[in-house]
Amino acid sequence: MDKFRMIFQFLQSNQESFMNGICGIMALASAQMYSAFDFNCPCLPGYNVVYSLGILLTPPLVLFLLGLVMNNNISMLAEEWKRPAGRRAKDPAVLRYMFCSMAQRALIAPVVWVAVTLLDGKCFLCAFCTAVPVATLGNGSLVPGLPAPELARLLARVPCPEIYDGNWLLAREVAVRYLRCISQALGWSFVLLTTLLAFVVRSVRPCFTQVAFLKSKYWSHYIDIERKLFDETCTEHAKAFAKVCIQQFFEAMNHDLELGHTHGVLATATATATATEAVQSPSDRTEEEREKLRGITDQGTMNRLLTSWHKCKPPLRLGQEAPLMSNGWAGGEPRPPRKEVATYFSKV
């Protein structure tokens, strides 16, 4: 158990490395899935293209959505995007940075699937077998005498060697080599293009927008850390709240048993009075528990606190916080907007 706890703590403290590892595992899994997939081209005109496009596009979409779902920050992004502005304005640049960071990792597995599919060539062969230039690669003198539907039917069977019967018009091996050559060229071009794009996004872009990049990165990390600390604080409060409630219940039951009362109205009133005294008495709780409760000792107050946190988060201005009024604004009314001027110096 200690080893698992250490691993879990390491993953929590190194979330970025953990997500990179998950993306790498998904990329390897996508390649393994394709190698284990039984590709069966229908070899029918009109159906080949639909089947091939489905194989080429549907699994990458599923892998992309899985990559987003497995990222813990997707809920944080949705919460930050949909929350009311309140006293803290929402920065679109931070939201874009958060989404781009998640999308870059989630796109790794789909890119691997598309690249492996194109390099293998089966999907491309099935989709474009009817577009082979028969006049150039085969017996072009026989093409004018064939109806278009018959020619399409013959070429659609090129991916299926067991039913292909058009060698008198076009050698199947010639068509397969021709289409696979084009597919592999497209595959390597796709790999090169995505590699260059990733290099530009990860390396070159921050050099031209360094200040904006640093600000977006900082506030993105701040939102993540703030949410984690809020969850930890709520968890500590819930544990302390539950502990005090259980202690009050047992103390009230013990008091009733000592007095010999039943669970009637009088016993309920006595238990309530005892519970109130237990909350207000510092001798029944340790100093740590009182600090975790932070003066919130009933359900209604906690619900109002959570509602206020969602609708009106505190401004990012330390040391100038005033108590909240009923409408969510400090001082009873909104403060007028102030123009802030910031100067950034870069030594790069």
From Swiss-Prot:
Its main location: membrane. Residues 1-20, 72-98, 206-348 are cytoplasmic. InterPro entries: CALHM. Disruption phenotype: Impaired perceptions of sweet, bitter and umami compounds. Mice are viable and fertile, with no visible morphological abnormalities in their taste buds or any altered expression of taste-related marker genes. They do however display a loss of both preference for sweet and umami compounds and for avoidance of bitter compounds. Perceptions of sour and salty tastes are unaffected. Reduced voltage-gated currents in type II cells and taste-evoked ATP release from taste buds without affecting the excitability of taste cells by taste stimuli. It is a multi-pass membrane protein. It is found in: Cell membrane; Endoplasmic reticulum membrane; Basolateral cell membrane. A lipid is attached at residues 100, 207 (S-palmitoyl cysteine). The keyword Protein biosynthesis does not apply. One of its GO terms (biological process) is protein heterooligomerization. Glycans are attached at residue 139. GO terms for cellular component: basolateral plasma membrane; endoplasmic reticulum membrane; plasma membrane; plasma membrane raft. Regulated by membrane voltage and extracellular Ca(2+). Inhibited by Gd(3+), ruthenium red, and Zn(2+) and partially inhibited by 2-aminoethoxydiphenyl borate. Changing residue 245 to S: Increases channel trafficking to the plasma membrane. Decreases ATP release. Residues 324-348 are annotated as: Disordered. Pfam families: Ca_hom_mod (PF14798). The chain crosses the membrane at residues 21-36, 49-71, 99-124, 180-205. One of its GO terms (molecular function) is voltage-gated channel activity. Specifically expressed in type II taste bud cells (at protein level). Not expressed in brain. Oligomerizes to form hexamers and octamers. Does not form gap junctions. Associates with CALHM3 as a pore-forming subunit in a hetero-hexameric channel complex. Belongs to the CALHM family. Pore-forming subunit of gustatory voltage-gated ion channels required for sensory perception of sweet, bitter and umami tastes. With CALHM3 forms a fast-activating voltage-gated ATP-release channel in type II taste bud cells, ATP acting as a neurotransmitter to activate afferent neural gustatory pathways. Acts both as a voltage-gated and calcium-activated ion channel: mediates neuronal excitability in response to membrane depolarization and low extracellular Ca(2+) concentration. This is Calcium homeostasis modulator protein 1. It comes from Mus musculus (Mouse). The lineage of its organism: Eukaryota, Metazoa, Chordata, Craniata, Vertebrata. The gene is Calhm1.
